[in-house]
């Protein structure tokens, strides 16, 4: 299959609201030659990254918008525009190959439309975009609701946040301290000719000069190292783990933090890791097996404690709550296409429900670390503020890290070009069992 068609079909599923790019793309990658998989991936992720900008350009070039049933043609047009403005593919090849894919859509009218619009884009696109630059949606390539939210919440940083969201993310490793120190693993990378340096905040983190195939990393198959962003790595030390503790990782998939907690403290009495979907726990088990670690995995709704909790209290809880994922857009650019403004209040409600449900499972004197990969205070400091107000037995603790910006509650890490993702942490201690 032509990589342009494969990318467009994956993107069409996203545009139709049927899938994320991570779930729709693998099936399409299986249909292209192995040598074209890199191009297919770039076309899909690159188009998603710049979709808000390309969509407004397409609106200028089209006489009328696409119907919902024509998401495949819309996606193919966006892939064509991405090639013209963001790749080194010669214009004649980008247009010819993209238009040629239209035959596979079984929509006879699509070929002529794509040919006309892409050729006009080649002639007039740069001038049209220049005239649209005043629109922050065009300038930042972020949907309007998100651009406005970031500007409102982060008036001094919002443009830098958008720039970081549009940048290619660095590849960051987490060294398994059960096997090597970070310095020792840096030496192994140097011996292998792989450029790398220590992360600023995570004691286990290493940022690679260039992304590489994990199979080329020393000891990857043996569990010496994993791929995980620096911001997500902070949870292991912030939780203040100690031997004999019973730990809960709520909403644990894909298991990176579960594994890191087990690596960080070999003497834990018990690790319970839960997630809503059983199929997502398969990935958690694969990660545990590669690292030769073990945890009790349970598929359940964390809010329904009667269905999974055995009544034995936890000394530590990590709640990496479901969120808008606005801090990891650079890794999942289709978030720009799928997330909507009205998702945020619903997510904040869910986050509060999770805190309320899990709090009774925490031992008096125990700690709960609340985390999200969101950059929106509605899901972060405001959720913690509301929880503290309704929970007399909860107190907030300072976070032992300089990462991020201090907030009224917790700390907010903003995505940085070449650095960590956007993330939020707040740490709570249970000082009394009763709740008002």
UniProtKB/Swiss-Prot annotation:
Lineage start: Bacteria, Pseudomonadati, Pseudomonadota, Gammaproteobacteria, Pseudomonadales
Protein name, UniProt field: Ribosomal RNA small subunit methyltransferase B
The protein's Enzyme Commission number: 2.1.1.176
Binding site for S-adenosyl-L-methionine: 251-257, 275, 301, 320
Keyword check for Transferase: yes
Similarity field: Belongs to the class I-like SAM-binding methyltransferase superfamily. RsmB/NOP family.
Record Pfam families: Methyltr_RsmB-F (PF01189), NusB (PF01029), RsmF-B_ferredox (PF22458)
Gene: rsmB
Active-site residue list: 373 (nucleophile)
